């Protein structure tokens, strides 16, 4: 219908936006936000840590249990049920129970179904509501904000410039054929050209399947590790297209007072039902009729 709905970072502006599009859901929205922040506090420390080792033995097992107990010692029964609901429930059912406004549901959907090759009514998708609350930021409960001017390649160039200032040698057009292993330790890599690079530490930014099953001799890995890596599901839920435009696109309904940063990121979002239908279409090998499109003007 041409309506542009904003998700503001400050409560007064967000409250005003909600009173415009979903007057009956305003109080429930902020109650839900506080609940999410409280639940995210239990999980946030695990973002930058290895998950608990469920197979640990002896003193190591005691240490794992102590660390987990310390994190959850203040948890209430309501919070336990809330965490279980978010870890196992569906985003669509959660939103349908909580809110009446379709526009509010679509606003939350646009920010909460990340990296999931599935529809919003599939089990586990409610976890997306906690995604932005697990990486610090506003009161250490808000994740990333903003995007890179010049596109994501600007990050690569900044890393390269900073590394070269520190004396790092960067080799391009040098595909790796194999990670060298000796006595159970990575000792470097061999390039497709046949050149070998020795190293005390080898870091791979390739996906786990290619790293462990493509670049490492599988005889060097435990059978359980090979099986676990092979079973990682990595179906991509999205495609990316870059356009070079002669001018900024005009969005129907975009208020004239929006600043450039506010106009630089917007989403063409389907309804919950259409988002579920999109996934079903992809499973049949079809392109959905109502695409979900994130638009970023990075320049």
Predicted regions and their residues:
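Short N-terminal secondary-structure initiator segments
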Residues: 2-16, 54-87, 239-274
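Dinucleotide-binding Rossmann-like beta1-alpha1 core, especially the glycine-rich loop
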Residues: 1-48, 81
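Secondary-structure boundary/capping signal
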Residues: 26, 103-104, 167, 220
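Short intrinsically disordered, low-complexity coil segments enriched in acidic
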Residues: 1-7, 154-157, 165-166, 199, ...
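Catalytic cores of large soluble enzymes that bind and process phosphate-bearing ligands
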Residues: 6, 10, 24, 28-31, ...
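Active-site/ligand-binding neighborhood in enzyme catalytic cores
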Residues: 37-166
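Mid-domain catalytic core of redox enzymes
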Residues: 147-149, 168, 174-299
């Amino acid at each position: 219908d041409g309506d542009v709905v904003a998700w503001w970072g400050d409560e007064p502006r967000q409250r005003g936006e909600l009173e415009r599009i979903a007057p009956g859901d305003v109080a429930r929205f902020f109650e839900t936000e506080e609940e999410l922040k409280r639940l995210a506090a239990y999980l946030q420390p695990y973002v930058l840590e290895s998950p608990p080792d469920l197979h640990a033995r002896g003193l190591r097992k005691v240490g794992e249990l102590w660390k987990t107990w310390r994190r959850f010692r203040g948890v209430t029964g309501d919070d336990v049920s809330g965490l279980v609901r978010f870890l196992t429930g569906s985003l669509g059912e959660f939103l349908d129970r909580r809110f009446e406004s379709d526009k509010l549901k679509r606003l939350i959907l646009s920010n909460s179904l990340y990296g999931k090759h599935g529809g919003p009514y599939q089990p586990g998708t409610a976890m997306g509501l906690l995604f932005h609350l697990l990486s610090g930021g506003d009161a250490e409960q808000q994740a990333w904000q903003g995007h890179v001017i010049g596109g994501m390649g600007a990050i690569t160039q900044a890393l390269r410039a900073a590394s070269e200032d520190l004396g790092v040698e960067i080799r391009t057009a040098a595909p790796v054929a194999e990670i060298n292993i000796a006595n159970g330790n990575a000792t470097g890599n061999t390039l497709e050209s046949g050149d070998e690079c020795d190293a005390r530490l080898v870091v791979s930014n390739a996906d786990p399947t290619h790293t462990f099953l493509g670049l490492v001799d599988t005889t060097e890995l435990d059978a359980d590790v090979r099986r676990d890596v092979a079973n990682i599901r990595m179906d991509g839920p999205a495609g990316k297209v870059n356009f070079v435009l002669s001018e900024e696109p005009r969005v129907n309904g975009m208020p004239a007072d929006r600043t450039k940063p506010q106009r630089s990121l917007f989403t063409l979002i389907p309804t919950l039902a259409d988002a579920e239908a999109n996934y079903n279409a992809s499973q049949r090998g079809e392109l959905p009729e109502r695409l979900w499109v994130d638009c970023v003007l990075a320049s």
